Structures are given as C-alpha cells and as structure tokens.
Amino acid sequence: MSGEDEQQEQTIAEDLVVTKYKMGGDIANRVLRSLVEASSSGVSVLSLCEKGDAMIMEETGKIFKKEKEMKKGIAFPTSISVNNCVCHFSPLKSDQDYILKEGDLVKIDLGVHVDGFIANVAHTFVIGVAQGTQVTGRKADVIKAAHLCAEAALRLVKPGNQNTQVTEAWNKVAHSFNCTPIEGMLSHQLKQHVIDGEKTIIQNPTDQQKKDHEKAEFEVHEVYAVDVLVSSGEGKAKDAGQRTTIYKRDPSKQYGLKMKTSRAFFSEVERRFDAMPFTLRAFEDEKKARMGVVECAKHELLQPFNVLYEKEGEFVAQFKFTVLLMPNGPMRITSGPFEPDLYKSEMEVQDAELKALLQSSASRKTQKKKKKKASKTVENATSGETLEENGAGD
C-alpha cells in the first residue's frame, strides 16, 4: 500500500465505499450458500474449498471491469473446519483430505474484498439433517449458543458501546447452554486492505489477556468482522500439528530472504495478495510454495493462520458477520442461511437483560434519503434489515 493511500483513508462515510462493501458482502453470501448446498455426505472438503475460492474469483471478476487497477478477490480463503476442528482447515492437494459424513458439524469461513473493502462471513450447519427432524444434544446446544452470541453482538456492536460489553454477553450466552467461547479469539475492526484493524473484541479472555486487551469504544463509520466461536467443551484451541496453509503478509516486517525459492515466492505474494490472507493452494507449483513459505514465516514476513483443534469428541460452532456502523444503525452485510427450527436445545438464555436484548429489533431506522444508484448485484443486500429477512435465509 502506498503512502498516499494511508494519508487518505476511505471510510463508509462515502456512498461508493458502502456500495463496494455491499457488493463484496453479496458475493460472500452467495458463495457461502452455494457451498452449504453442495455439502453432503461423501463430499471432499478440499473440493469445496477449491469451489469456494474459484467462485469468489469468478464473481469478483464480473464487477468494476473498467477499473483495471482495482484489486478484488479473496479476503480469506475458503476454510471448512469440521466437528472439533476450530478454524482454518483448508487443505492442499498434497494434504490428507477430509470427506464429509452424515451428522458432521461443519463450519464454512470465507472472505471477499472489493478494492480492499472486506466482507467476511462464517456459518455452521450439520450434514444430512432429514426433513422433519431436528438436531439435538450437544451439537444443537453449541450451534444455538454461537448463533445467539452473534445475534447479541449485532445489537451491541454500535456507536457508544464498549467492546467489553460484547465479551461479557458472549460469556453469559454460551454458559446458558453449558458451552464456552473459544479462549482468546479476536474479532477485528476492518479497514481498506486491513483484515486485522486495531480495535478488537476478545472472547473468553484469560486473566492475563484481560489485563493486556485494549478497551475500545465503537464509533460511527467503523466496520467490524464479528467472529463468534463457541465450544461444547472447555474452549481451549490447540495446534495439533496439522499443516498451516493460510498466511498473510505482515507489511510492518522486513527481512532479506536468503533462498531464491523464498524470494520468488514472496514477490508473488506481494504482487497477487498484498496484505490479504491467501492459501498455498493458490500457487501453481504447490511444492515450491511449501518450500518458499518456510523462510518467510520463520522471519515473520508472513503470519500463519494455524489450524486449531478443541478436544476430540467436542463440537465447535462458528458464526461470523461483517457489520458497517452507519449513522442510522448497524448494517449487517454478511450472514449465512441459518434455520433456527432445525436445532432443538433443552437449554435457553435465562438472563433477563440478555433475553430483552435478543428480543429487541436489529433493523435500522429507515432514512428518507434519495437512493444512490447501486449495482443490481447489491440490491438484495442494501435494505439494511437483518439479512434473514432479505435473502440470507432462503
């Protein structure tokens, strides 16, 4: 990113920026729905990850065609983490694949950007739920808990509120279902070309993290990727030795790479992905990419997104949405096709204050402002109602 870009930060105070976010959100929602529909027993996770990434590239290739210099595409590679796998499972062709089976709890996580404006989304569902039946037991508990955490956050991430209010609500919601938010996971503010902005919301912090984590107030015209990860177990995510395949460049780090393979790999990263997360799958020669990444990661030019696991036998559910803090209320631009009636838990939120919050409306005040001409592709993401009402649930 050039110095000029840094001086003139573009925000959602500009209509065109809002349109770019919505277009990215619309693509993210459509790709997600397509992957959910394609997920069934016997389907390979690798094939779904490849399909998701290919669709994002294809769909972003259809917009702003005249703007030859504009970067657009994947803001987070398609990851599909099953059951006790917490996040970032996105295998290479040379890795062991995972084949989906009946009853698997599946989390799909992906991101799209248009001109560096990022729309992230994640969704959880269970494979092969027969019509007329419901998911029960711990899978239902953890999915309900995570979904209600996301719904609480949609109502709490608004100007004037603090990030700590969201953290507290998440703990209360999860505990009502005898579940635990994954310890130390962060939701980030988003800025142009930046997926990990400085303001964050932490989940289930340790005592040390509570001391270290910056308190922050949400402000109008900010954007957040709100990421909820809840476990049926203790909420501790560990690296189990699975190969990391997703990385992002850290623009603040510099180092003179010694190996020719590393240098060639890193210059391709800079050219193609800038500071967006990418997968080693995106390289033509996967073997060279696997070699090139080692020196880059060792010297912290690249940050890894490690594949994390909860204990065997536990379940982890994830819901992530991107929200624009508009002057007339929060606008959620991404969301999955959640069907609440499929999940039956014996537990529910007991806390009266939280119950009232969850029952309150999350739709925005309508403005009598003349609509700017937005692209056809974003019409169904522009109403600003919660997306369940305008197509995210169909």
Swiss-Prot record:
The taxonomic lineage of its organism, from the top, reads:
Eukaryota, Metazoa, Chordata, Craniata, Vertebrata
Database matches in InterPro entries: Creatinase/aminopeptidase-like, PA2G4, PA2G4/ARX1, Pept_M24, Pept_M24A_MAP2_BS, WH-like_DNA-bd_sf, WH_DNA-bd_sf
Report what the protein is called: Proliferation-associated protein 2G4
Regarding protein family, the annotation reads:
Belongs to the peptidase M24 family.
Record keyword Chaperone present: no
PTM statement from Swiss-Prot or TrEMBL = Phosphorylated on serine and threonine residues. Phosphorylation is enhanced by HRG treatment. Basal phosphorylation is PKC-dependent and HRG-induced phosphorylation is predominantly PKC-independent. Phosphorylation at Ser-361 by PKC/PRKCD regulates its nucleolar localization. Isoform 2 is polyubiquitinated, leading to proteasomal degradation and phosphorylation by PKC/PRKCD enhances polyubiquitination.
Gene name of the record: Pa2g4
Gene Ontology terms: biological process: negative regulation of apoptotic process; negative regulation of DNA-templated transcription; positive regulation of cell differentiation; regulation of translation; rRNA processing
The subunit structure is: Isoform 2 interacts with the cytoplasmic domain of non-phosphorylated ERBB3; the interaction requires PKC activity. Interacts with AR. Treatment with HRG leads to dissociation from ERBB3 and increases association with AR. Interacts with nucleolin/NCL. Component of a ribonucleoprotein complex containing at least PA2G4, NCL, TOP1, PABPC2, RPLP0, acetylated histone H1 (HIST1H1A or H1F1), histone H1 2/4, RPL4, RPL8, RPL15, RPL18, RPL18A, RPL21, RPL11, RPL12, RPL28, RPL27, RPLP2 and RPL24. Interacts with HDAC2. Interacts with RB1; the interaction is enhanced upon PA2G4 dephosphorylation.
Q: Which residues carry this modification: Phosphothreonine?
A: T366, T386
Give the start-end ranges of region Necessary for nucleolar localization: 2-48, 301-394
- Cite a GO CC annotation: nucleus
* Induction context: By mitogens.
